[in-house]
């Protein structure tokens, strides 16, 4: 699942903590398919070690991690806040973690909803205050008392360090922000400090148990993709493929989609986050399938682009080869101790050279005039077709922190995607401002844009850097052209088009084409 251009791999901010080095720092590790499972729960001792590391990174005072509230809309599936989850592993709504430190003294409190037999009839059993210590090794408190306890602690300590869903929204403030507003109002002299970066630095290096869950998430995700391809044929609805994949994930123990599933055919393949998934795939088109599952709270992220009729056209094949070559070029840079930036640089060079050869850009370094008339600037022509980052970390959320954003280097414990893409929108020339210089650019690339219009290709895999090597956890889903075409040459699974026709009549007033 692509991220915006601003998240493209880049030089990190300076950090004063030492970077771990290995004797084999510059040795290229073999990228392999997944190995045997670890098969164990994350121990309470690992969560305790995470809290120890966080306390060591923060000054004395009060730290607060806020869990997510109970969903308010029709009992939708609850997802815990990743910061709170990382530090506790506790998956009930309405909980909070408070850590108080002063010198060598330290106390940890987990605030949870109290037992309520009448309420539990509706939403399931609660651990309750009494169950916290024997289960999690923390001191339990009732969530109803959180505000009062914080007020008493903040009367002594001048700062509150917070991690949670804070400061993210441009408009509506989150419930976490609203809670902190009340804390500030009650304690006007207290400084509220964003502690998310401190937790992110810990989350960026995955433990063995976390890597095991990410491996399983990748394996199950790939099997869902394979199941979807068994149905692929001209005339199928995008949502049928989505349903086939998501069924396999749940059947195999996945938690459900790790982000909004993207299945985009034809022109929809050129929309990065298209997730309506309601179009009918047509003969001669490509279809981008960017969908994945969580497993035990850890997110995979996998994208494949395949021909609806089972065979790539010459134009589709040409664009696909460039994107695959870019991914392989980046993949060759994945080595312990290697610079993370080299992955993006290698992929970008391949994409730019390939687009030049197809006539879609004038040269690898060519630019066009972008911005506004008042603030004109030059942008790479490459960015007309490749406007997102090469990849991102994966973990408790699909766009998770990874240590390379801090250290600039790949190390054991990294977990990330590599996902180059090219998107030739039919109206691409309309995106280019109509300046005298740009008119000449449009004239030179216009024929190529028309030739490759509506071709969108993205190829994405997940990479886990372990003590014994680098695992491409999504490798079971083919990416080579010959392997994809061979897979699609197999007999198609039967489907009932009447069901889809019914949907079409209700949504559009006409049957499926």
Language-model segments: what does each one mean?
Residues 6-9, 38-513:
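Active-site neighborhoods and metal-handling regions in enzymes and metal-associated proteins
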Residues 21-35:
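Bacterial N-terminal signal peptides
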Residues 15, 26-27, 38, 146:
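Generic short amphipathic/hydrophobic targeting helices enriched at N-termini
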Residues 1-17:
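N-terminal secretory signal peptides that target proteins for export/translocation
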């Amino acid at each position: 699942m692509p991220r915006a251009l601003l998240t493209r791999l880049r030089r990190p901010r300076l950090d004063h903590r030492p970077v771990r080095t290995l004797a084999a720092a510059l040795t290229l590790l073999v990228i392999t398919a997944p190995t045997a499972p670890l098969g164990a729960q994350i121990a309470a001792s690992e969560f305790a070690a995470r809290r120890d590391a966080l306390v060591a990174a923060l000054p004395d005072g009060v730290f607060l991690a806020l869990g997510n509230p109970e969903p308010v809309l029709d009992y939708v599936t609850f997802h815990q806040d990743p910061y709170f989850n990382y530090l506790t592993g506790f998956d009930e709504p309405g909980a909070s973690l408070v850590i108080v430190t002063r010198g060598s003294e330290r106390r940890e409190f987990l605030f949870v909803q109290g037992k309520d037999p009448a309420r539990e009839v509706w939403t399931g059993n609660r651990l309750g205050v009494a169950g916290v210590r024997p289960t999690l090794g923390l001191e339990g408190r009732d969530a109803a008392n959180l505000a009062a306890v914080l007020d008493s602690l903040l009367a002594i300590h001048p700062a509150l360090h917070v991690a949670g869903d804070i400061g993210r929204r441009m408009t509506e403030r989150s419930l976490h922000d609203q809670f902190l507003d009340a804390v500030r109002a009650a304690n006007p002299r207290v400084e509220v400090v964003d502690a998310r970066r401190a937790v992110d630095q810990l989350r960026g290096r995955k433990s063995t148990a976390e890597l095991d869950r990410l491996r399983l998430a990748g394996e199950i995700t790939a099997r869902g993709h394979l199941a979807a391809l068994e149905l692929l044929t001209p005339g199928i609805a995008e949502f049928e493929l989505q349903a086939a994949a998501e069924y396999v994930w749940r059947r195999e123990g996945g938690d459900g989609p790790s982000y909004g599933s993207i299945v985009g055919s034809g022109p929809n393949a050129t929309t990065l986050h298209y997730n309506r998934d309601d179009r009918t795939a047509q003969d001669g088109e490509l279809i981008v399938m960017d969908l994945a599952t969580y497993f035990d709270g850890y997110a995979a992220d996998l994208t494949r682009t395949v021909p609806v009729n089972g065979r790539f056209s010459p134009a589709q094949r040409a664009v696909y080869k460039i994107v695959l070559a870019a991914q392989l070029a980046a993949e060759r840079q994945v080595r312990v101790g290697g610079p993370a930036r080299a992955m993006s640089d290698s992929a970008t060079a391949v994409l730019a050279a390939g687009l030049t050869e197809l006539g879609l850009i004038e040269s690898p370094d060519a630019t066009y005039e972008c911005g506004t008339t008042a603030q004109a600037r030059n942008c790479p022509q490459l960015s007309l077709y490749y406007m997102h980052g090469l990849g991102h970390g994966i973990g408790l959320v699909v766009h998770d922190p990874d240590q390379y954003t801090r250290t600039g280097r790949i190390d054991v414990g990294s977990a990330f995607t590599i996902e180059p893409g090219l998107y030739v929108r039919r109206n691409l020339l309309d995106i280019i401002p109509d300046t005298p210089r740009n008119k000449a650019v449009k004239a030179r690339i216009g024929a190529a844009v028309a030739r490759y219009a509506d071709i969108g290709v993205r190829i994405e895999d997940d990479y886990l850097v372990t003590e014994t090597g680098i695992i491409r956890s999504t490798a079971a889903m083919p990416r080579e052209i010959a392997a994809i075409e061979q897979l699609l040459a197999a007999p198609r699974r039967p489907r009932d088009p009447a069901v889809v026709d019914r949907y079409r009549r209700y949504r559009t007033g006409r049957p499926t084409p």
